[in-house]
Amino acid sequence: MGKTLSEIAQQLSTPQKVKKTVHKEVEATRAVPKVQLIYAFNGTGKTRLSRDFKQLLESKVHDGEGEDEAEQSALSRKKILYYNAFTEDLFYWDNDLQEDAEPKLKVQPNSYTNWLLTLLKDLGQDSNIVRYFQRYANDKLTPHFNPDFTEITFSMERGNDERSAHIKLSKGEESNFIWSVFYTLLDQVVTILNVADPDARETHAFDQLKYVFIDDPVSSLDDNHLIELAVNLAGLIKSSESDLKFIITTHSPIFYNVLFNELNGKVCYMLESFEDGTFALTEKYGDSNKSFSYHLHLKQTIEQAIADNNVERYHFTLLRNLYEKTASFLGYPKWSELLPDDKQLYLSRIINFTSHSTLSNEAVAEPTPAEKATVKLLLDHLKNNCGFWQQEQKNG
């Protein structure tokens, strides 16, 4: 049965009951893990989940008594540090084309950005933002902050005291910069909270912080820089010695795999959405090559339809797509070469017909029993003959 994103947010922040087998199966409570790593395809609801999780923490804070609204807002802000698409929306370009003024990247003023930028300014972190940004972008492309950290201009340093100004970043470079701002703050959070004695910390701004929620950072990076970013993030998380919890969502198999292999003490999930508007958060074992690649998503979707006796005509299209991806990976020139030899022509015609059935006014939505059996036959043939790994069922 599906859940709402608010219910999944509650699941992520609550110790879970798991079954263990000693001499007999017993139920135990698993504490909220240090790292929860979530894979989901684009459009599933990752960003909405990060928003619902933030709202969940706010509702817990607002249950308190004896605090006015401003105090509650400050407390909720300090309980979670988050990065998502809404974080990027807090930055915008000021382009004065008529006056040919230098483009400026400006920050939307609100309680969150005021808190964040004031901390970075007070901690003297502008040089670290520049360093992180140049690592993932261009080592000559240099940000310049105004005194309040509310406006940023960019120049290209030539190395001979020459500077090319009037530079506006590409969308990818802009995402890199915003991530660098967040990562710089996160680095300070981990470093400061690693000081066990609160009285000895450089600032008390993070004393109430419980969670860091990171949703799909810098999806515009090439693979090499994405791997570097994931390794750096994993290293920072591993260096955290406090009780801080991390939740990371991504649609990138590469980013997921690096974090999966680099991090210990993690619990991994796949987030799925259903047509009725509900969601499922399913615990997974193994990296994305075993659990999350798109071809495996296709296979699992078809398997579920077969198990539920809910095969529809579009499942033939998914099946053909699965055959095509498997054939491409194995080096076959045609996907039809993977079909059973004795029925290849017949089955190929069926898949081609049903894949293009939208062109026919006579096509009905419900496949015949024979067509449903064909889907199962073809899927079983592919699984049994192309070496698909079968995940074993595990207890917690």
Curated annotation (Swiss-Prot):
GO terms for molecular function: endonuclease activity. Its EC number is 3.1.-.-. It is an enzyme of class 3 (hydrolase). Disruption phenotype: Loss of ACNase activity. Keywords: Endonuclease, Hydrolase, Nuclease. Anticodon endonuclease (ACNase) that triggers the cleavage ligation of tRNA(Lys). It is activated by T4 stp protein and masked by the prrD protein (the endonuclease subunit of EcoprrI). The prr locus restricts phage T4 mutants lacking polynucleotide kinase or RNA ligase; T4 mutants lacking these genes manifest a T4-induced anticodon nuclease (ACNase). It is thought that Stp and other T4-encoded ACNase factors counteract the masking agents, thus activating the latent ACNase. This is Anticodon nuclease. It comes from Escherichia coli.
